[in-house]
Regions:
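Sec/Tat signal peptide C-region and signal peptidase I cleavage site
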Residues: 14-18
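Alpha-helical cap/lid subdomain in secreted, periplasmic
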Residues: 95-221
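A structural signal for isolated positions on well-ordered beta-strands in alpha/beta enzyme cores
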Residues: 27-29, 55-57, 146-148
Length: 223
């Protein structure tokens, strides 16, 4: 998504001290699920077009909630597919722990997100988000790492996802609740960057119609 690369690379470049040279490579780690997989799908191509060298890691479990992320961390579970794109060279390491991926690179940015059906439900972020953020801050190897929260998109109007019922199967309501909740969490947890993927998709729907997903909730491969 254009919003991801714009906000993480163009709008929010890594902070450098007077002694540091500009980084040759920008490193982004997503602690997420299939929606983070969609969110980073075209980052490498966008980065190349912008003349930026990029390493992207995605800690992937389909449908993974913040509660499950924290359970994996607290129990040290090697539960993730660690999907990595290193300047166009892709790899996948199954049965990886969050700590292992976290310390694999000196990440410039780490993104977090709630599972899609709960993204607009504030209470589902707690107590897991503060604990997860503290763990990430403690164990990240780059002291200048910056954190971002991924504002995911609402489902298609005709989506059959069971979690759509949380919003009365109303796309507009789901979008509004996600935006409100993500902004509230980002302020409370002092997360400086909100990645507005949901707003980008909703704007696209307003312009081109509700044809943005391949199954009612995951993004279409042609986007």
């Amino acid at each position: 998504l254009c919003s991801l690369i714009c906000y993480l690379i163009v709008c929010c470049p890594p902070t450098l001290t007077a002694q540091q040279q500009p980084r040759e490579v920008v490193r982004i780690l997503a602690v997420g699920n299939s929606f983070s997989d969609d969110g980073v799908e075209y980052l490498d191509e966008l980065a190349k077009a912008a003349g930026i060298r990029l390493i992207v890691g995605n800690l992937y479990i389909g449908g993974c909630s913040l509660e499950r992320h924290w359970e994996n961390v607290s129990k040290g579970l090697p539960a993730y597919d660690y999907r990595k794109n290193c300047e166009g060279v892709q790899s996948n390491t199954p049965k990886t722990s969050l700590l292992s991926a976290l310390q694999d690179e000196p990440w410039d940015y780490i993104t977090v997100q709630q599972v899609s059906q709960n993204s607009g439900l504030y209470d589902t972020y707690y107590p897991f988000m503060p604990s997860l953020l503290q763990y990430l801050r403690t164990h990240a190897t780059n002291p200048g790492v910056r954190f971002a929260i991924h504002q995911v998109w609402a489902y298609a109007c005709d989506s059959n996802h069971s979690g759509f019922a949380n919003y009365d199967n109303d796309q507009s309501r789901m979008y509004r609740e996600i935006v409100k909740t993500v902004n509230r969490v980002s302020r409370k947890e002092h997360i400086p960057i909100v990645i507005p993927s949901g707003t980008a998709i909703q704007t696209g729907r307003n312009l081109m119609g509700d044809r943005m997903t391949r199954d009612g909730f995951h993004l279409d491969y042609g986007l």
